[in-house]
């Protein structure tokens, strides 16, 4: 029987149960009983807090992509709109099917109108993507590629096809919003501002890590390890961007740091799930590294 995907708190519980079983700390019967009730177990965090935590994550990503005070406020408002659409989609199959396109259209419209009014600085797309980052299928892309590498062709191809379709729908929503608002082409240039200095990436990592811990109801004791891998990922990504700006070197180094960092944590703390400390890094890498920002800029950039 296929059920909903496991939350990270459930993944952590599975890893802990496996470790305790292999270490003879718990009998098989107790481990089996724990695993059987795991999928139906309620989250430790109320649903409304889990939903609002996405706004925190979006603001954290904004601090990395477009660190400006006004941009932070507008991205937070757009993310709140996306969260509202996510809640609606739980009761509407049509909305759920078209959610990436609808959410991208709504968020992009809000940000472009704010940019047209002169409320935010820098490239508008860099303020759009943090608001819709929660819908970008970074985990699916990683899992699909991993399955293809492991010769699991059917599962890997299916995941990649679904992830690419999600990205295409998000891109179409952005393009429609641009056609509707028809902003000044200069607002669509990939220009980054930096009004907060070194505090921006530090605070961004904390907000992303804390928001994901709330949303996935992860044990708070795992937060330091999640923040460590996130900080390592961001540092490697920044160094790569400084070394080779305008290329994928920063993304490659960031992804490598996330993989290596999570493996090191798993060795140091075998009771912790490597997946739990690894996946949050995708919210750092995904918005500007999956091609969505680049493709949208190519489609919309002024001649």
Locations of the language-model features?
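Membrane-interface helix termini and inter-helical loops of multi-pass transporters
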Residues: 118-123, 181-196, 300-302
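Alpha-helical transmembrane segments of polytopic integral membrane proteins
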Residues: 58, 82, 86, 107, ...
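C-terminal transmembrane helix-loop-helix hairpin of multi-pass membrane proteins
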Residues: 127-131, 143-146, 151-167, 194-201, ...
